[in-house]
């Protein structure tokens, strides 16, 4: 209503607000309660996610290998003590292969991970608890209803092969904050539909475009035919050599363009 919305919590308390910014993940309860429809595409892959300790220092460098069954990413972490031998891994695999990897004991899993990662960080010393997450592309038909705006994975999820999901979420937050500030400065409610529609118009086309590009990359790296592999390798090498183009790609991925 004109006074905003009321949110009933599990403990029985009620919170009133002019705007609910819903960033409650891919299985968003807020999205469900608001009746916002979702388009979904199952990749038929699962991501194995865990934290590992490696023999070699990661030097704050993210590494990703595009394997025939799916990409494997090592994302650098730093402990409170400053140790630089831990990485978060995201290993995308077909469902049956992922299940087999999950069934391995820690030692066998570390060996399989070393082989898949080409031992770029030396031996895998230890592995934490593993999680298997189904990979799906999701996109809300609408991000907003009066008083509510979806952000991040609540609005869209994409394949993790380029790590763009979190960047898209950050860009959603920036856009919503800017539109809310603009509305408040004009004397409007932050949950006003005109404000939220401006947010949606800013973010939806960009998110859809990024999702399409990531789907193209996924298909490109899945194709193991010789002509495509040669073209792919030559193209990646060319981008890496051409500084201005490389910087343009990086800035686009970071949402700075």
Q: Model-flagged regions — what are they?
A:
Residues 27-62, 72, 93-97, 113-114:
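Central beta-strand plus flanking loop segment that forms part of the substrate or channel wall
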Residues 67-134:
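Conserved FAD/dinucleotide-binding core of flavoprotein oxidoreductases
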Residues 159-172:
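A conserved FAD-binding loop/helix module that cradles the flavin
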């Amino acid at each position: 209503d004109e006074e905003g919305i009321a949110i009933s919590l599990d403990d029985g308390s009620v919170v009133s607000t002019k705007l609910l910014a819903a960033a409650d993940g891919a299985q968003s309860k807020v999205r469900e309660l608001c009746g916002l429809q979702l388009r979904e595409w199952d990749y038929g892959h699962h991501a194995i996610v865990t934290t590992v300790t490696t023999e070699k220092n990661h030097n704050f460098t993210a590494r990703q290998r595009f394997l025939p069954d799916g990409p494997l990413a090592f994302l650098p972490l730093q402990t409170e003590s400053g140790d630089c031998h831990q990485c978060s891994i995201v290993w995308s695999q077909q469902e049956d292969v992922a299940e087999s990897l999950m069934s391995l004991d820690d030692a066998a899993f570390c060996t399989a991970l070393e082989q898949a990662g080409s031992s770029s960080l030396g031996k895998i010393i230890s592995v934490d608890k593993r999680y298997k997450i189904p990979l799906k592309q999701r996109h809300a038909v609408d991000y907003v209803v009066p008083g509510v705006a979806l952000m991040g994975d609540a609005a869209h999820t994409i394949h993790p092969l380029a790590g763009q999901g979190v960047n898209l979420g950050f860009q959603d937050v920036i856009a919503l904050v800017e539109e809310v500030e603009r509305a408040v400065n004009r004397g409007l409610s932050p949950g006003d539909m005109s404000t939220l529609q401006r947010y949606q118009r800013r973010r939806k086309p960009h998110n859809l475009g990024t999702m399409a590009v990531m789907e193209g990359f996924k298909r490109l790296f899945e194709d193991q035919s010789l002509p495509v592999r040669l073209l792919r390798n030559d193209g990646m090498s060319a981008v890496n050599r051409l500084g201005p183009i490389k910087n343009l790609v990086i800035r686009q991925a970071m949402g700075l363009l």
